[in-house]
Amino acid sequence: WARGEDPFPALAATLSESQRGAWAEDLGRLVELGRAVTVEDGTDRAERLADAGRLAQRVFPDHELGARPAGLLYEDCESRGERTDPMEQVTFRRDVETLAGLVDPWVTRSRIYDLMVERYVARYGRGGVCEDPLAFFMSLAHAPDGDAQMLRAAGQDLASGPDPERAAMPGGVSASPRHMGAYLQPVVVGRRASADDNRTDEPAGAGSGGRLTVVNAFTNGNGALQARFHRLLGRQYRQRLARGIRAAWGIDRVLEIQVSTDCNTAQAVSCGVLPPLGLPGEPESAQAVPLSSLRLAHDPRTDTLFLADARGPVGLAYLGLISQHRLGGYLAWLVLLSDPWARLAPMADHWTSRRRRMDPLPDEPVHSPRTVHGRLVTRRQSWIFPAGHVAGLLDRDSAATLVRVASLRERWGIPAEVYVHQHRGPDAVSRAATFDEHKPRYVDLRSPASLLALHGWIDLAAEHLSLIEALPARDQQAGVTPSGRTTALEYLVGLQWPKNDGDMR
């Protein structure tokens, strides 16, 4: 079927009489699902989802595509409340501006991109033109796994620190502007969770108004995370996002690299914000501009590469769900052309931000204070313990466990609510119950049930545990539902820096 078309009526039209007798009823329910979810209330939509899940369990046998109900992706959203734009709040905007200043020198031109330009110039010369861009990108993708230059360039990007000179380098006419996305969580401070909670009423950096803004994690800020929801939020949202992308790229024609099935088919949900770049194996579209119709050229003024046709340069945007570094083959290099920036700022509590700046884990407990810049928290307070220091306090005697954990909290000043990371040794193979050691676990150190769950969660291969303050704690959440209940609130903010003058056409 054509890109964007409802697949179920198209599939129903292909059935033979015998197939229609076996499957027509199921297909009819799926066809109806698309209409029903737009008019029914939340309870009925949930029942529709459960019905589709039961159908998926019959269609996909156990273990064929993973755990049941593999093959089913359903998304929904509903809100009766109105949210104000957080950037209209002076203090929050100031926090975002502070963060932008901190991460600015960390958003630099990638050395992998430099290598791509170097290999292009070696083949086509300065100012040269390649009539077959796909062939060039595939030649890069077919480099051997042990390519020393590629490994060195990737290592330099990972190990590099802030570099204003590389931050000032152009990325090319086809590329995005420098960008960074940040997940920011507002915190209401000045309350105490309970009488036994030893946190101070005003945490460091509370500033005026009794509020903090915590940097939870970084992502990209080119619009990909917003594109993730364009099908849910509708046409006007999609058009506004497309206008914003074209304005930021500084070019009227921006094509979307739509990799609808790479890694998983959920990639397709973000496709469709911009006209697609036609790629081999992708669904056809009347709006697509084939890669084969474009030329790849070198701009000697900026030492960058760009795509163009007879009308002039075109921009590229990759808005997919799958991270750029996980794409394979020629696609990784094509996406690099659209987004040549390394974004490895350590100012967040995400696993990669913490581990990147951390020395070898110690054999003794270590406390790291909160890092604040005015009201902006870029690193939560944390404690690292050898795993035995914590695991040894936990057993099935809940009373004894509570006493020992309370003593640990009092000695180290640990709040009642924390997130726990476990660090397994380099030779560990077992995933145990966690499957992914990078995912933190919320723990209430006052709760026997929470401590018992923590005891069962810790991998036997874990060598160290990190306890990171839960900021906000449950009583510090800044969100409020339409009914007045407190709830978690997190903003995704996209930071973009204006393109270098040499990148504008």
Q: Where in the sequence are the language-model features?
A:
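Long C-terminal appendages of very large multidomain proteins
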Residues: 273-278, 284-505
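Long, compositionally biased intrinsically disordered terminal regions
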Residues: 261-279
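Type-3 copper protein
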Residues: 1-266, 305, 415, 420-505
